[in-house]
């Protein structure tokens, strides 16, 4: 039998951050899922008549956008979605990590990336169409950028054991009033609940540096997961691959109800901004660098001319 691989300090830190004894894992009252759902039901009910017959999809990205710059939010509303290297690299990298968990040979990052591209090209969705028609330059850039992320993940993380129940890009969905659909995909989840005792860890993998929205993203997922399962996750953890650094946050009832309130406030703001009843605000920041409204935004240009650094980004 082969000896287990020796772990480097970054990998040892991951184990230390994610590990917890059974006694250290909190327990939650089963009624919390019903109270959270009631909070959303009551908070979103005033908008039911306005949206009757329609479906409103609410994601972490939509909430993050409207809580930021309203001008950018409206500009992106008018943009037709199109796949690109920056949008596809995360999905490719996540698929490669998923394959690495079950790979029977030594995981070679670029081999995993190529297998992921091949597998996802066989689909019937928009990403598959783009992968089948992208240029050779785009494909080369995609391989390079996805490979960088997979290499860093395998360097910084210990091999994921089957008993940890690792799942990549786990889909979450919650429907309220048959109108509002809260949904998303968790980059990586580990562990499981034991009855009312929390045990699951939700992990978001990022490049770049910290942004406050990263905390809200995982809290949003924790809210949906709690209503789905009844037992909240134990821990939320944003992991910055470029830095080899964790930003962990323990899940509490207060955190979950705060997230529910943010969803209610966010939906109200989305509908208000889209009515165009008042001028949208402008909130210059690192995201101005890739904003579709930058050409006509003096505030954004001034911000970038000051040389502010870009914040962290999703995969």
Q: Language-model segments: what does each one mean?
A:
Residues 90, 94-101, 222:
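Short, amphipathic alpha-helical segments that act as regulatory/interfacial helices
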């Amino acid at each position: 039998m082969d000896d287990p691989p020796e772990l480097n300090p970054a990998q040892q830190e991951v184990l230390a951050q994610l590990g917890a004894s059974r006694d250290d894992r909190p327990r939650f009252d089963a009624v919390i899922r019903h109270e959270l759902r009631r909070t959303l039901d009551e908070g979103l009910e005033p908008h039911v008549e306005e949206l009757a017959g329609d479906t409103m999809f609410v994601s972490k990205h939509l909430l993050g956008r409207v809580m930021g710059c309203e001008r950018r939010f409206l500009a992106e509303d008018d943009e037709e979605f199109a796949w690109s290297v920056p949008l596809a690299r995360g999905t490719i990298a996540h698929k490669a990590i998923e394959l690495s968990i079950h790979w029977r040979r030594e995981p070679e990052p670029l081999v995993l990336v190529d297998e992921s591209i091949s597998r996802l090209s066989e689909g019937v969705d928009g990403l598959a169409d783009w992968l089948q028609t992208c240029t050779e330059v785009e494909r080369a850039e995609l391989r390079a950028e996805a490979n960088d992320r997979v290499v860093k993940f395998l360097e910084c993380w210990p091999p994921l054991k089957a008993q940890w129940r690792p799942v990549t890009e786990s889909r979450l969905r919650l429907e309220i009033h048959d109108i509002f659909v809260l949904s998303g995909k968790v980059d990586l989840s580990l562990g499981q609940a034991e009855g009312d005792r929390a045990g699951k860890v939700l992990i978001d993998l990022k490049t770049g540096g910290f942004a406050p929205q990263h905390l809200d993203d995982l809290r949003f997922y924790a809210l949906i997961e709690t209503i789905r399962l009844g037992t909240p996750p134990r821990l939320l953890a944003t992991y910055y691959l470029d830095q080899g650094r964790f930003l962990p946050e323990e899940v509490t009832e207060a955190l979950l109800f705060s997230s529910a309130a943010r969803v209610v406030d966010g939906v109200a703001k989305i509908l208000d901004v889209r009515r165009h009843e008042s001028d949208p605000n402008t909130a210059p920041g690192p995201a101005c660098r890739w904003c579709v409204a930058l050409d006509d935004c003096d505030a954004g240009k001034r911000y970038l001319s000051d040389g502010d650094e870009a914040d962290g980004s999703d995969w």
